[in-house]
């Protein structure tokens, strides 16, 4: 020991002085201490060692001899159960071992590791100590085993001491005893990297060169050749394989032969040696079907691979999954091996696929070896080869997130628009792996971020499933829609709530994700329901704060709305049934009236036939209403209409029928618009007292014939109308002021046709009979006129196509034709119309008529005659408001189809222009009012942000704005009648708040897209304040008090996030008065 230790022992207790004297070799001090106290000779220190042990450690032979003579115990053990003989054998001290053995030391004593002094003696190169111990041992004690069941021969082979091995074998030591791992001494001798270990191996093999000894397998199936190959000891391998009984192709427990081990570790020389001494000629494979060439290829040992490929017995066979050694090399990035194989094997198939369809490029892309991918692409590897999952190498790279490989493949021509068998795109696999950079690269290469697979899932949903926030942010920044639903109705928010990713939920809501989207299945779960099922308390609280609803809450709201809609449906259905019933009664009444008119016309025709037989009644009278009559006679013809009918006419039914029918009211009771009309203009069809002029027009069957007439000289004169022919078709007689009889006015006048040229336009004066001329129509003329009128009626029906316009139709051309009065009374009409409208009709509609209808225009625009001016003067005197021109309108069914369409189109365009002008004016006025109100509201908000000191003034401004909005609403909104009477108190308290609450809650449920709006583009949470300002500037006055009474609608929190509260509010009484006032109005 050193000096400090000596001082320590000498300066402590008495026992320490004895140990110190033994270490220092102070024999005198040791003798004095032992004489003074005999117990000190075996005194133990803190390690349990006696002075004799310290004498062995310090090599104090004389002190040890003195202690043994004084009676010290030679077999005393320390705390490790080792005696002085153990220590002497461990140090290899031959003199102490001899001294102790002569003093009968126990050579079979075992320490805590169950090792005897014989085990410890094998550590030293000198065999003297081992030979000394073997002299004292019996023949069976040499194979004593330690705790690991190893004998002294195991330790000698381990320490590579061939002399010890020979000595132990000479003393009958067993060379076939396995230790705890199943290894025999030959395993330990072969498991040595020193080439000199071959001597130990030879010593053991020389003792028993048996096949069992050479091919002994430990508990893991490894032979001594496996260990020799593992250490790369070529000499030992050469010695072992030199024996013919050595099995080169023996398997271990993993079905790997020594050749597999040599290929895996890259020992090319050993590989060559084993291939040469392999007598079987076959290359075995392991449990996965991999050959030693696979092992060499994946480890990038090009020299070893070259040795394999040059040997004729080696073939590049596939493993159990169909992968060759070339694929193994590509998967491990063994570029040197790939180049070697491509150079040595010209027939190698670079695009060969395994049983799953994967190629070498698939394996390289999956592992992320950029250099390998480039090497394969340079050697014409197929860049878009697909496996059984329809995955290309680019899919494998996107799944693992290898950016460099992805860019290399895209530059090499890989397609980015492919999908696999499940419809997953490259972006789906990148999102499933959470690779945000890869997602950005793919989006830059024109991949749609909203692409859906066959289940309807988007890449954003895949990223939300894993909670990859960075990937989700990249997708939504590139316009990924967070509200897209898959086929089951789930969105990205459903997946985030299901897995409890709060940060992902916040990100989705910041990008305008709809929190109340429902599934398509029977449960109809919302994202909040997923959070409730998973008991995600933080997510539940956050979703409720942002207006999320469960399916139970949505069903309650839907039930409320359905009830309201059903009530409205019942009211509308009752109204519709009532309306249909009234219309049915009205139609029956009209049918009865038409039937009655038809019977009256038949009766009147019979009376006319009787009247023709009498010569007095058939005498023609003067026609004061025709254009050629004098002004005085025209004025006098109006006089009888202003006088009440005589008693004779009231009593005689035949006379009453000739004056216009039995139901004709007196001029004193008729409206003013009918009192000024003469009997000539009012027509011949009788009308009931309660029948309107429109209904009377429907009952007529008047017509206009556009055809030339034939004169007395045999020539065809334009517009010559035979009175005899027309008298047979008249439906009644009109009274004239000068004539004492009745004047039969024809209801159908013949108008000049297109073939008449060069005739006088004033044909009416020449063709119609004068007052003093009397002509009696012959029977042949009556028959001819009847036939012509019948054919004309048939032609009218053909032109109409059998269609009858409904009563009261406002469609142009839907009214039935009327009589064209060629006289001055034709300017008179039944209903009043201003002069502007009259001019428009005269110049607009009738300007489109052809030249052959000049008679129709002359009745409207003939200003040269004095008769027309006098008629207009009389019309002003009798009726201050001139009537419309429908009284002189032609039968539009007789006009050509093209002309009718032009008239209808012109009328429609005029109405459409008028409607557009009104709509534009309303839009301009509404926009100006909205601008003023928004300007006022912005001013108030600016005052509030600046912290206005005068709070009362700000309140007054707010109240003024509120009243202004309320006044506008009252002016624009018509009063609505409610079917159910309510009290003023209930309306003022509940109605406005309930309306606004239902509107906002439905908006939360169905979102903005359900209101007919275009979905907003994804935007950050910073834009929410701008949207809130826009919503505040809305002109719906109900929204200003949206929060009033909202919490009373439901017992749970269903409303959306309320707007931030201001410091100053309107007084509750003022708000209630405003609401009450709006409902009362």
Swiss-Prot record:
SUPFAM superfamilies: Ankyrin repeat (SSF48403). Residues 638-649, 863-872, 1051-1061 have a biased composition (Polar residues). ANK repeats lie at residues 13-42, 47-76, 80-110, 113-144, 148-177, 181-213, 220-250, 254-283, 288-317, 321-350, 356-385, 389-418, 422-451, 455-484, 488-517, 523-553, 1022-1050. PANTHER family: ANK_REP_REGION DOMAIN-CONTAINING PROTEIN, ANKYRIN REPEAT, PH AND SEC7 DOMAIN CONTAINING PROTEIN SECG-RELATED. It is found in: Cytoplasm, Cytoskeleton; Membrane; Cytoplasm, Cytoskeleton, Spindle; Nucleus. A motif (D-box 2) lies at residues 910-918. GO terms for cellular component: cilium; cytoplasm; membrane; microtubule; nucleus; spindle. The D-box 1 (destruction box 1) mediates the interaction with APC2, and may act as a recognition signal for degradation via the ubiquitin-proteasome pathway. Keywords: ANK repeat, Calmodulin-binding, Cytoplasm, Cytoskeleton, Developmental protein, Hydroxylation, Membrane, Microtubule, Nucleus, Repeat, Ubl conjugation, Wnt signaling pathway. Required for normal renal development and establishment of left-right axis. Probably acts as a molecular switch between different Wnt signaling pathways. Inhibits the canonical Wnt pathway by targeting cytoplasmic disheveled (DVL1) for degradation by the ubiquitin-proteasome. This suggests that it is required in renal development to oppose the repression of terminal differentiation of tubular epithelial cells by Wnt signaling. Involved in the organization of apical junctions in kidney cells together with NPHP1, NPHP4 and RPGRIP1L/NPHP8. Does not seem to be strictly required for ciliogenesis. It holds the Pfam family Ank. GO terms for biological process: kidney development; negative regulation of canonical Wnt signaling pathway; protein localization to ciliary inversin compartment; Wnt signaling pathway. Residues 589-889, 1051-1081 are annotated as: Disordered. GO terms for molecular function: calmodulin binding. It is a peripheral membrane protein. Binds calmodulin via its IQ domains. Interacts with APC2. Interacts with alpha-, beta-, and gamma-catenin. Interacts with N-cadherin (CDH2). Interacts with NPHP1. Interacts with DVL1, PRICKLE (PRICKLE1 or PRICKLE2) and Strabismus (VANGL1 or VANGL2). Component of a complex containing at least ANKS6, INVS, NEK8 and NPHP3. ANKS6 may organize complex assembly by linking INVS and NPHP3 to NEK8 and INVS may target the complex to the proximal ciliary axoneme. Interacts with IQCB1; the interaction likely requires additional interactors. Interacts with microtubules. May be ubiquitinated via its interaction with APC2. Hydroxylated at Asn-75, most probably by HIF1AN. The gene is INVS. Residues 589-610, 688-698, 724-740, 772-785 have a biased composition (Basic and acidic residues). The keyword Nucleus applies. Residues 555-584, 917-946 form the IQ domain. A motif (D-box 1) lies at residues 490-498. The modification 3-hydroxyasparagine is found at residue 75. This is Inversin.
């Amino acid at each position: 020991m050193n000096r400090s230790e000596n001082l320590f022992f000498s300066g402590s207790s008495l026992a320490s002085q004895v140990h110190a004297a033994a270490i220092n070799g102070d024999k005198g001090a040791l003798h004095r201490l032992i004489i003074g106290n005999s117990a000190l000779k075996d005194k133990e220190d803190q390690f349990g060692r006696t002075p004799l042990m310290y004498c062995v450690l310090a090599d104090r032979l004389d002190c040890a001899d003195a202690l043994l003579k004084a009676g010290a115990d030679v077999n005393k053990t320390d705390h490790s159960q080792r005696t002085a003989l153990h220590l002497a054998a461990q140090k290899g001290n031959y003199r102490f071992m001899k001294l102790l053995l002569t003093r009968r030391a126990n050579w079979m004593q075992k320490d805590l590791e169950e090792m005897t002094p014989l085990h410890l003696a094998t550590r030293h190169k000198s065999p003297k100590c081992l030979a000394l111990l073997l002299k004292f041992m019996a023949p069976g004690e040499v194979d004593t085993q330690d705790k690991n069941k190893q004998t002294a021969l195991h330790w000698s082979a381990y320490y590579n001491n061939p002399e010890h091995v020979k000595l132990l074998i000479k003393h009958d030591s067993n060379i076939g005893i396995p230790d705890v791992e199943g290894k025999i001494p030959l395993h330990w001798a072969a498991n040595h990297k020193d080439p000199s270990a071959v001597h130990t191996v030879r010593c053991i093999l020389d003792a028993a060169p048996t096949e069992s000894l050479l091919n002994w397998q430990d508990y893991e199936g490894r032979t001594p050749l496996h260990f020799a190959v593992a250490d790369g000891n070529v000499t030992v391998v050469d010695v072992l394989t030199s024996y013919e009984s050595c099995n080169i192709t023996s398997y271990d427990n993993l079905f790997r032969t020594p050749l597999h081990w040599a290929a895996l570790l890259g020992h090319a020389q050993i590989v060559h040696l084993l291939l040469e001494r392999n007598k079987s000629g076959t290359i075995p494979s392991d449990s996965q079907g991999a050959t030693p060439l696979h092992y060499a290829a994946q480890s990038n040992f090009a020299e070893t691979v070259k040795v394999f490929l040059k040997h004729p017995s080696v073939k590049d066979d596939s493993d159990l999954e169909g992968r060759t050694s070339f694929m193994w090399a590509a998967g491990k990035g063994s570029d040197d091996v790939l180049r070697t194989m491509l150079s040595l094997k010209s027939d190698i198939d670079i695009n060969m696929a395994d049983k799953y369809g994967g190629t070498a490029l698939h394996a390289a892309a999956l592992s992320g070896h950029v250099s390998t991918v480039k090497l394969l692409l340079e050697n014409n590897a197929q860049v878009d080869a697909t496996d059984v999952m329809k995955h290309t190498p680019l899919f494998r790279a996107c799944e693992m997130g290898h950016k460099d490989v992805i860019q290399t493949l895209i530059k090499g021509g890989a397609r980015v628009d492919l999908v696999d068998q499940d419809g997953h795109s490259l972006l789906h696999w990148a999102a499933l792996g959470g690779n945000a950079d890869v997602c950005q690269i793919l989006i830059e290469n024109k991949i749609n971020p909203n692409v859906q697979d066959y289940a309807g899932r988007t890449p954003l949903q895949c990223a939300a499933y894993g909670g990859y926030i960075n990937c989700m942010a990249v997708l939504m920044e590139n316009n990924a829609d967070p509200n897209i639903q898959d086929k089951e109705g789930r969105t990205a928010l459903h997946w985030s709530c299901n897995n409890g990713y709060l940060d992902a939920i916040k990100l989705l809501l910041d990008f305008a994700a709809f929190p109340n989207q429902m599934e398509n299945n029977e449960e109809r779960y919302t994202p909040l329901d997923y959070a409730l099922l998973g008991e995600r308390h933080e997510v539940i609280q956050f979703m409720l704060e942002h207006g999320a609803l469960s399916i139970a809450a949505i069903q309650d709201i839907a039930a409320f709305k359905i009830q309201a809609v059903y009530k409205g449906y019942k009211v509308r259905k009752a109204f519709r049934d009532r309306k249909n019933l009234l219309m049915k009664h009205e139609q029956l009444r009209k049918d009865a009236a038409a039937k009655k008119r038809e019977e009256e016309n038949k009766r009147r025709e019979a009376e006319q036939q009787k009247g023709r037989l009498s010569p007095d009644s058939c005498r023609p009278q003067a026609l004061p209403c025709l254009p050629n009559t004098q002004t005085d006679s025209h004025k006098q013809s109006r006089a009888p209409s202003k006088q009440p009918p005589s008693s004779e006419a009231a009593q005689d039914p035949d006379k009453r029928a000739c004056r216009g029918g039995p139901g004709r009211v007196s001029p004193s009771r008729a409206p003013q618009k009918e009192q000024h009309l003469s009997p000539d203009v009012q027509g011949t069809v009788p009308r009931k007292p309660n029948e309107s002029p429109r209904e009377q027009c429907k009952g007529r069957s008047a017509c206009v014939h556009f055809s030339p007439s034939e004169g007395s000289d045999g020539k065809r004169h334009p517009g010559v109308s035979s009175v005899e022919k027309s008298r047979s078709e008249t439906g009644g007689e009109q009274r004239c002021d000068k004539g004492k009889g009745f004047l039969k006015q024809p209801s159908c006048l013949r108008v000049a046709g297109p073939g008449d040229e060069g005739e006088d336009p004033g044909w009416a004066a020449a063709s119609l009979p004068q007052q003093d001329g009397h002509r009696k129509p012959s029977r042949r003329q009556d028959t001819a006129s009847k036939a012509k009128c019948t054919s004309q009626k048939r032609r009218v029906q053909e032109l109409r196509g059998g269609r009858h316009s409904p009563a009261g139709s406002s469609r142009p051309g839907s009214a039935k034709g009327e009589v064209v009065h060629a006289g001055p009374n034709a300017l008179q009409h039944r209903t009043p119309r201003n002069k502007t409208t009259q001019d428009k009709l005269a110049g607009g509609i009738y300007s489109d008529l052809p030249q052959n209808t000049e008679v129709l225009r002359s009745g409207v625009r003939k200003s040269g005659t004095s008769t027309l001016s006098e008629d207009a003067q009389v019309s002003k005197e009798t009726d201050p408001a001139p009537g419309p021109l429908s009284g002189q309108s032609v039968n539009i069914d007789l006009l050509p189809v093209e002309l009718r369409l032009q008239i209808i189109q012109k009328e429609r365009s005029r109405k459409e222009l008028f409607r557009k002008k009104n709509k534009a004016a309303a839009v301009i006025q509404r926009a100006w009012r909205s601008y003023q109100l928004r300007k006022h509201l912005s001013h108030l908000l600016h005052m509030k942000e600046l912290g206005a000191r005068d709070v009362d003034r700000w309140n007054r401004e707010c109240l003024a704005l509120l009243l202004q909005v309320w006044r506008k609403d009252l002016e624009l909104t018509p009063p609505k009648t409610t079917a159910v009477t309510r009290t003023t108190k209930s309306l003022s308290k509940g109605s406005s708040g309930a309306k606004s609450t239902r509107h906002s809650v439905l908006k939360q449920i169905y979102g903005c897209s359900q209101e007919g709006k275009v979905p907003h583009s994804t935007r950050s949470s910073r834009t929410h304040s701008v949207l809130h300002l826009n919503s505040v500037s809305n002109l719906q006055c109900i929204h200003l008090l949206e929060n009033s009474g909202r919490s009373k609608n439901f017992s749970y929190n269903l409303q959306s996030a309320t707007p931030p509260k201001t410091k100053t509010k309107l007084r509750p009484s003022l708000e209630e008065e405003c609401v009450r006032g709006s409902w009362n109005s």
